[in-house]
Amino acid sequence: MEARYVIFDLDDTLVHSDAVRAAFGVVAEEMGVTRASMSSLLDAMPGRPAFEIFLALGLRRAAARAAAGRFLSLLHDLDSELPTVAYPDAASTLQALEALGSTLMLSTGSSPARAARVLEQEGWDAFSLVLGSDRETLKGAAHYEQISAEATSSDWTSHAATIGDSPRDMRLGAEHGVPIRIGIDRDGDASALLEAGATHVVSTLSDILPILTAA
């Protein structure tokens, strides 16, 4: 296996938590939207930044940014009540990739502070770049621009892989020329991931290792 840049999503890829949906639910109710409606929207837009979720509810950009700020504040508080839990194979998978010489990067819709807190909680210090989302920078093209600025070669994407649970992760990878796009499907329906450009779909995180080793 050649040394690769491996870009990971965070929530529902490396870790899981009830705090994210709980925070969205509280903000939804404050806006007069039912938790059930918000849950359906989150199912339809997995992995999207909070700002985009609130835009999809019909809010104007300024109101959506304010709602996203409220969401992040609630998420910070709820994290202590509803702790983030790593998937059982997350640590060993990251360790294996580090041993193979991979450059690990994190691109998440969560805030930079929460991303850093989760990595510290789990003792995951192998990530060379940790990109969160806030009012200035959202997960998406802006994160790829930051990765390009940090990469040691201009053709870094040709030696990259992206790992995530949402169609958006796959779409972003395809749009930016990442050849290996691995979707994590733990629900048994990979159609949305494949339609969005996933080159591989796995059900557990450790299943990415044979794919990356053979590439």
Question: What do the PLM-derived regions correspond to, one by one?
Answer:
Residues 5, 140-170:
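Conserved Lys-Pro-Asp/Glu-containing loop-to-beta segment of HAD-superfamily phosphomonoesterases
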Residues 76-106, 112-116, 141-142:
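Short, acidic loop-to-helix structural element flanking the phosphoryl-transfer center
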Residues 38-43, 124-139:
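A short, structured active-site edge motif that brings together acidic residues
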Residues 131, 200-207:
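Short acidic-hydrophobic, aromatic-tinged amphipathic segments that line or gate anion-handling sites
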Residues 159-202:
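Acidic, Mg2+-coordinating phosphoryl-transfer loop and its flanking beta/alpha structural elements
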Residues 24-30, 48-62, 118, 147:
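Helix-loop "lid/cap" segments that line or gate small-molecule binding pockets
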Residues 1, 99-102, 150-158, 215:
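Glycine-rich phosphate-binding loop signature in dinucleotide/nucleotide-binding domains
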Residues 1-41:
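Active-site neighborhood of HAD-like aspartate-dependent phosphohydrolases
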